[in-house]
A protein has these predicted regions:
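HotDog/MaoC-like acyl-thioester-processing domains
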Residues: 1-13, 96-152
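Hot-dog-fold acyl-thioester-processing enzymes
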Residues: 2-87, 152
Length: 152
């Protein structure tokens, strides 16, 4: 792998990447839910058993946090000249994520646009698909990233 940064000009529409391996633990599910999403199906085995989840499941927001960690690790490994993100256009939680699941991510660059007002940066739209260890699609998202242009 090159030590050179990946810039806006290096991104190609349609390019894909697969990365990450994040194993969700029961402790993480309970800790995250207790602090940020204390719904009973995230916290109680007994309650979760009476729902369509069937057992304790991770909060969708916890799933997003795990995905974010894998994305940042990938960006750091690829040495992308990233400048953050103005947000998501779409987010879907398709299947529950359970303690013990191992997640991975596949991304695709949808398109990129140079900034008209900030020549030092551009933006790109990407689609992410999140799979568990059984290759079941558990979440999808479309987001916008900001990235530095070469020479700026």
């Amino acid at each position: 792998m090159s030590d050179e940064l990946v810039y806006f000009e290096d991104l190609e529409d349609g390019s894909t990447a697969s990365f990450g391996r994040y194993e969700d633990t029961r402790e993480e599910v309970l800790e995250f839910a207790a602090k940020y999403d204390p719904q009973p199906f995230h916290l109680s085995d007994e309650f979760a058993a009476t729902t369509h989840f069937g057992r304790i499941s991770a909060s969708g927001w916890h799933t997003c946090a795990m995905v974010m960690r894998m994305m940042v690790d990938n960006l750091n490994e690829r040495k992308q000249a990233g400048l953050g993100s103005p947000g998501l256009d779409e987010l879907r939680w398709l299947k529950p994520v359970y303690p013990g699941d191992t997640l991975r991510v596949e991304t695709e660059v949808l398109d990129k646009t140079p900034s008209r007002s900030r020549p030092e940066m551009g933006s790109f739209r990407s689609a992410a698909r999140v799979y568990n260890q059984d290759d079941v699609l558990v979440a999808t998202m479309k987001s916008i990233g900001l990235i530095r242009t070469r020479g700026n």
